[in-house]
């Protein structure tokens, strides 16, 4: 009753290859009678002919937009294997003719083959119909989701079994629930992506995986390679090493998609047999189960199957146990993140399991370079002079605090950052993209204050507002931005022994909870990261000419730094994050700032002042204006030109990006208008078709009524004719009788 037409061209093919052809019975007509027709599945259309040799089809069924429904066999209609091709499918799309077709096959297998073939045509463009689909076609479609070693169905089943079923006794040997396997198969064939949860039976998923491999049109090892692989098994029985080498040669000669799938399956089965003490599935048992699905002859006659069963089992067992030699791992260097002592990313790396490594290799993904943060210890001339002059004055310095350490940003290794707009930013503020930043007005203002003993100290007042990593306040010297870190969730760790207390007036005090270290080491952590294109020089600054960096915010996704338009140094703005608000006022570091130059000769006085600052909850900084002003003025011109050239180039880059994004937005809007116009036209056409359909229904009803009226008139005429003939017959018979009665006999 049914015939496959995949490799030959039928007379109805007109030069195109048919997917499937055979005899089916179709119900049609007003009286719903069954007609036997020759059906040909070609492309996305199903043709039916009166005879196999006919060239002109009686009709065509357009499959796209339809769906197939199987009718279960019942006791009322035994021997009828029915299925419907009805409108619907994805999002209930309507077909061109809005008709449904009831078809009947001769056997259950015949019906299932037709249903699978039709579903493959309907759902193939949407990723469905994968059961019975060619492996290369499935891989070609799924390339849009990334390169993979195996189809997504195989990956999903393997991942689920790896998580929940490796210790299940009788895995792959015990069958799953047939109805659940059928439901999952139908779901995948209809383009759906069903997910497995904790209630899903492991044996059902394992049966689904075996079913997919069994229903491939051509097995993982192609038919042309079947005899070559069997010869390898014969060689293995004689000389194992030579057999393994020959098997490696044959495996490498497989097509790429077949090689990748075989590699994926063998590695997974080796992982399964590693739990053989629990699941009772050794390599030999797994080879018995998977061998016929991986290696099978083209003609499956009983004699060939019996002869090749033992050989296939032996060969499959070798491929599982020696998969490391047969499928060498790709030696691709993968970057491993190296976190510094106070890196922004403090999460430790977890050891990946075998399944995770295999999925990484399957997805062909490499670990993207992560933004690095490292701390180095250059020595500041200013701090060195202070240490040499008064070792006891800075004995309590914190070498590991963010203010005293260098936060180096490896821009070359960081991934590109997306530009984000924040309405909370002031005009002129910008977002750093790959290390670039735009200018804006500074918020913080330096306020010189007088200490109790009469010495001047510069106090920086700013408000740090962020939910993530905070940047401390530092001065800019020679065009270099010094950035410290204040992280709200790792204050205790990042400050390494410096406690933080809040005062009623909003000030912040950093107290020393760590033992003092030698003065020679305390001067090695005083500057922060510098840009490579700006030379770092340390010199004293005067109080009047000093411009400090109030605050800056650093996160793993964006960095925002603002510059004053007419200033000699960089001043950063703050960033607002929606998660939480964190304010810091009058932030100072007495250890980094150091004592006033006038008080270096009296270490004891400086210690007393430090104690008073600690008790009062404040820290201050004082610098000498007479010694630092001349040096700073000398470096102002070079800093000014370097920073403004950088700002101008970054502004140009942001302008280009803005133009590009605007053009993209306009093109998308234009495309949206075009699609809306097309949608309106399609809606109009749909309404017209519906009106036509309604008119045709009305005409059909009128025709049926006219037919009924004609039949009634015919009946009436028939009765009238019968009455007329009966009456006419009576009239002709009576005169004859009277004539006979009046006859005169003459003798």
From Swiss-Prot:
The keyword Acetylation does not apply. Keywords: Angiogenesis, Cell junction, Cell projection, Coiled coil, Cytoplasm, Cytoskeleton, Developmental protein, Differentiation, GTPase activation, Phosphoprotein. Residues 17-123 form the PH domain. The record marks 173 as: Arginine finger. One of its GO terms (cellular component) is adherens junction. Interacts with FLNA. This is Rho GTPase-activating protein 24. It comes from Mus musculus.
